[in-house]
């Protein structure tokens, strides 16, 4: 992904946000920044639907699993994804917790673009499981005019989301509230590492401060 005039510093933003996820013990796809021919930074990831020798690995995104055409990728809810995970994952209880962790992380880091195509199940070996996270990005600092907080509704809401909404969604998804609260504490514990990563990132000083202000 190269730089874009419409949304400055997106490659640096996405690579940093993926590193923040790793610091919070969220599995993510392999990723990196690279220098492009014009000297600017670009963002790359490695495909996880191909094995080392090029064999195809089964992978279905949530548009496919919930029978939504791509143009309706925003017309669903987090709870609907949870239903698909419960129905198709080989390890649904674990994957539901991992899914909630990504939802919480995305909310805290200003990512309101986690639509149906940004969650997938794949089968790297014999079992279907939630794929490592991808397309993690702080949209709030890249596009501050967008006031929605979630791409997909949670507890019927896309904005003004509170802890109670995540806890209610946890109940709906079959996740114990204490587990969700534990995930939130895990994100809090990662905050010192996040601050270091942001301060040492390739973002401009202004963008660094915007990111720090958002998560503080």
What are these regions (language model features)?
Residues 59, 76-79, 96-98, 182-183, ...:
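Short coil/turn segments at secondary-structure boundaries
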Residues 7, 52, 71, 89, ...:
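Hydrophobic alpha-helical scaffolding
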Residues 87, 128, 172, 189-216:
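Regulatory N- and C-terminal appendages and interdomain linkers associated
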Residues 61, 65-84, 122-181:
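Catalytic-core segments of enzymes that bind and process phosphorylated/nucleotide-bearing substrates
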């Amino acid at each position: 992904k190269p730089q874009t005039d419409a949304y400055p510093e997106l490659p640096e933003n996405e690579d940093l946000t993926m590193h923040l996820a790793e610091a919070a013990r969220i599995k993510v796809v392999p990723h990196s920044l690279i220098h492009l021919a014009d000297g600017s930074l670009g963002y790359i990831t490695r495909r996880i639907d191909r094995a080392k020798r090029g064999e195809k690995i089964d992978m279905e995104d949530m548009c496919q699993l919930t029978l939504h055409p791509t143009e309706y990728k925003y017309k669903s809810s987090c709870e609907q994804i949870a239903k698909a995970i419960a129905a198709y994952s080989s390890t649904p209880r674990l994957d539901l917790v991992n899914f909630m962790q990504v939802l919480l992380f995305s909310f805290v880091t200003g990512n309101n673009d986690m639509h149906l195509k940004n969650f997938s199940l794949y089968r790297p070996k014999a079992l279907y499981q939630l794929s490592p996270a991808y397309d993690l990005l702080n949209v709030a600092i890249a596009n501050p005019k967008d006031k929605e907080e979630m791409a997909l509704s949670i507890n019927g809401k896309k904005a003004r989301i509170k802890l109670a909404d995540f806890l209610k969604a946890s109940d709906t998804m079959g996740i114990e509230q204490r587990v969700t609260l534990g995930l939130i504490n895990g994100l809090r514990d990662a905050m010192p590492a996040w601050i270091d990563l942001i301060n040492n990132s390739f973002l401009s000083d202004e963008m660094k401060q915007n990111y720090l202000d958002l998560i503080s």
